[in-house]
Amino acid sequence: MLTPLQIYFPIGVVLLVAVVLAFTMLGLANVLGPRRPSLVKQTPFECGSEPIGSARERFGVKFYVVALLFIVFDIEAIFLYPWAVLLLPDGQGYPGLGWPGFISMGIFVFTLVAGLVYVWKKGVLDWAD
């Protein structure tokens, strides 16, 4: 029987090699890399074309709101996936889930749909402005 130290030793070796390799690459890049700044190196890259305007522009708050909504509904999908896997057909799923699991997930989905309707009615997703 293997001890926990014997089981996790290869993982520790791989982790140590990865850390040493990463710091070695960073050190070599710092030592061997050029240190002469120029205007071309400090210009932001925009798909090969000349940049228009400043790189320090403000973005509209709508981008952040949409990003937060994406995260909320992405987390909803993360919570829905295990529940759906537990409800496999043909008796392969978890038998103890039953109606309480279905009702609790229904409440969860209803709450998120109500939030989406609220956000939609408030005009957060309207980009016409």
Curated annotation (Swiss-Prot):
Which Enzyme Commission numbers does its entry carry? Answer: 7.1.1.-
Q: Which GO terms describe its cellular component?
A: NADH dehydrogenase complex; plasma membrane
Q: What is its main location?
A: membrane
Q: Name one GO molecular function term.
A: NADH dehydrogenase (ubiquinone) activity
Q: How does it sit in the membrane?
A: Multi-pass membrane protein
Q: Which keywords fit this entry according to its UniProt record?
A: Cell inner membrane, Cell membrane, Membrane, NAD, Quinone, Translocase, Transmembrane, Transmembrane helix, Transport, Ubiquinone
Q: Where in the cell is it found?
A: Cell inner membrane
- Respond yes or no to whether keyword NAD is given for this record: yes
Organism domain of life: Bacteria
**What does the record give as the reaction this protein catalyses?**
a quinone + NADH + 5 H(+)(in) = a quinol + NAD(+) + 4 H(+)(out)
InterPro entries xref list: NAD(P)H_OxRDtase_bac/plastid, NADH_UbQ/plastoQ_OxRdtase_su3, NDAH_ubi_oxred_su3_sf
Give the EC class as a word. Answer: translocase
Membrane-traversing stretches: 9-29, 68-88, 97-117
- How does this chain assemble? NDH-1 is composed of 14 different subunits. Subunits NuoA, H, J, K, L, M, N constitute the membrane sector of the complex.
Family, as annotated: Belongs to the complex I subunit 3 family.
Please give the function described in this protein's UniProt entry: NDH-1 shuttles electrons from NADH, via FMN and iron-sulfur (Fe-S) centers, to quinones in the respiratory chain. The immediate electron acceptor for the enzyme in this species is believed to be ubiquinone. Couples the redox reaction to proton translocation (for every two electrons transferred, four hydrogen ions are translocated across the cytoplasmic membrane), and thus conserves the redox energy in a proton gradient.
Listed name of the protein: NADH-quinone oxidoreductase subunit A
**Which species expresses this protein natively?**
Anaeromyxobacter dehalogenans (strain 2CP-C)
